Swiss-Prot record:
This is DDB1- and CUL4-associated factor 6. The modification Phosphoserine is found at residues 336, 649, 657, 847, 850. The modification Phosphothreonine is found at residue 654. Residues 676-705 form the IQ domain.
Amino acid sequence: MSRGGSYPHLLWDVRKRSLGLEDPSRLRSRYLGRREFIQRLKLEATLNVHDGCVNTICWNDTGEYILSGSDDTKLVISNPYSRKVLTTIRSGHRANIFSAKFLPCTNDKQIVSCSGDGVIFYTNVEQDAETNRQCQFTCHYGTTYEIMTVPNDPYTFLSCGEDGTVRWFDTRIKTSCTKEDCKDDILINCRRAATSVAICPPIPYYLAVGCSDSSVRIYDRRMLGTRATGNYAGRGTTGMVARFIPSHLNNKSCRVTSLCYSEDGQEILVSYSSDYIYLFDPKDDTARELKTPSAEERREELRQPPVKRLRLRGDWSDTGPRARPESERERDGEQSPNVSLMQRMSDMLSRWFEEASEVAQSNRGRGRSRPRGGTSQSDISTLPTVPSSPDLEVSETAMEVDTPAEQFLQPSTSSTMSAQAHSTSSPTESPHSTPLLSSPDSEQRQSVEASGHHTHHQSDNNNEKLSPKPGTGEPVLSLHYSTEGTTTSTIKLNFTDEWSSIASSSRGIGSHCKSEGQEESFVPQSSVQPPEGDSETKAPEESSEDVTKYQEGVSAENPVENHINITQSDKFTAKPLDSNSGERNDLNLDRSCGVPEESASSEKAKEPETSDQTSTESATNENNTNPEPQFQTEATGPSAHEETSTRDSALQDTDDSDDDPVLIPGARYRAGPGDRRSAVARIQEFFRRRKERKEMEELDTLNIRRPLVKMVYKGHRNSRTMIKEANFWGANFVMSGSDCGHIFIWDRHTAEHLMLLEADNHVVNCLQPHPFDPILASSGIDYDIKIWSPLEESRIFNRKLADEVITRNELMLEETRNTITVPASFMLRMLASLNHIRADRLEGDRSEGSGQENENEDEE
């Protein structure tokens, strides 16, 4: 029967089912494949069961109940038919809940959930809250994005997170794990943030993983194991059967926000942040024959950073049904009061970026011939005195995802939010990231009181010698852009001196802050604090050529990281300003970069380095003069011994080591004193990057399928949140939420847009079809769950309105790709710094003028 059939046909199908003439399951597939149902959808009920944004919804197996998790850290089981709450569970989570699932075959009594601080809770509805709070897994570093259960398996579940690992837990072995630096349950180490997972319904041993390098990797779980089971592979390529990347995203870091298998397992739906939705066949292999871009082509693409704009923190004006593109607002004269100021500051940053980019280009040409000994005065004079950020490799995943700094935040007194990180073993360590309430309203009704932690670092003696004019350093801004988490991007603000900025710039502007939410990680704490007896030094067996190849390989294979780097500072104050609950942390005056990343603009890295910027290449390239990397020149006595043992443990962890390093975000790693830990982290990061590069090279020799895009679905906008779902509905439809507050439904086979539903005042994140009936549940920034069913008497699809929304979304998607969210305090600090710079320049001009007059008088 055709999809465009009429109701009499459907009634006849019902009649045949009642007579036993047809399989009952076929009726569902037929009515779910009809446009009549899709285009008659209407809001049937609203479930107001939460006090925060609803980030996850899930039907039970019978379709009778809905499990939901929210920013209020509560789990709620509700009945959408009676509109009543069955159970409200105080989950024990201390950060926003991002994913929650019923364990299969447990009569809806057992639940697994994860949150922004990385903690996973295993909850039994029939047990008391205190018992459930003991059943937690704190294994992940950073945000845990998704929980996935295995069909018909009540004992095991999987999780993925910012640390780049996919972990497999078995509740028969343990129902909790608070072990420090736990690696027992790692199933796959992707070496890139793993943001989404999906299991093939008919063949559950096929596991799809979406990573922050734009790739979707499909694994055969039968070939994988964990350390707990005794057969951990330790390689990211083991068990991989397919790897999918849209061709235009090959050189970009575009995060996967949603993965979904079709019911028959023949196709996979992938939704990308700041991009579109793609359908591909995992068994396809036609992309293998396509030419991959050369390293030079990849570097050339990385050299064209986009010009960024600024958006005030808490400004959700670009979301919701009434959002308009900037060009349309200007035309209609609807500019908000702060637009002109934001535009001016955006223009200012753009000028800085352009200047710095020109400097980077010139440095790239000079870097090959310049001796390592130092930087000429003429080179210094060409560098900008304002923040230098030529490596503005903020990729097209300019989501609003904040950099965590939970160690700077005091616990909130509100039950709906807690910024104090959960710690189970050490007061200086805590699971990373506490993405807080992500709604605009919550920013006004909740706030986090930030405590000031002041850390002062002394300048290196070499730095003082290299400084052209002591006492003339100008304070400039140091920015750190990060995209970890699920809601919004932010900039971390730092102050440094002019020479620090110049030294950083003279190195080819190669000091990069980690992007992807600092997903390119640091070393485990166990590697940082080895036994004191371990004092034997083992230098890495890497030559300068190897390091150079590593730098170029990283430039080519780790494309367009989502960050802004301006400089690192030898003198800074780690003092957070304020933190609103709306979008994770606010502005943090902290170390601007924990791990320098070599990019295309730092080709040979032959420029001088400051003590604070002792990067990976310096630790390995200087073998000819000093076989051991130099970290803190002032480290003496016991601290020096600790430094040596710490360095040793990092150096010993090469790519041949059994201790496979995972991505550890910078906020988790900053617990150590001084720069010693940071330097060790950079060495560890070097080995991890090299290991990743080797695995990527192995992909060419392995029999791994590379599917081509089968269909692309456009019209929606997915840029402001990292938990936006795309889903199949029946055999003939595909749907997704959007930043415009609408639900989009397309024809699966033709990508024709069939339905548009206004479903949220800001952003629709979650869409879950009923397992049997033509009912849809949705949620987003609003504090409720909406139930949709085909109640309209006639089709209500407005094609003209849909075309208008699609056009606006396309324009605003381009705008959002080039937009960075900054807190209001950032503007104030920036203006104050600029004022200081101007004052110092005027004073310098006066002193220069008086000096010239004195010289003229002497000559006379």
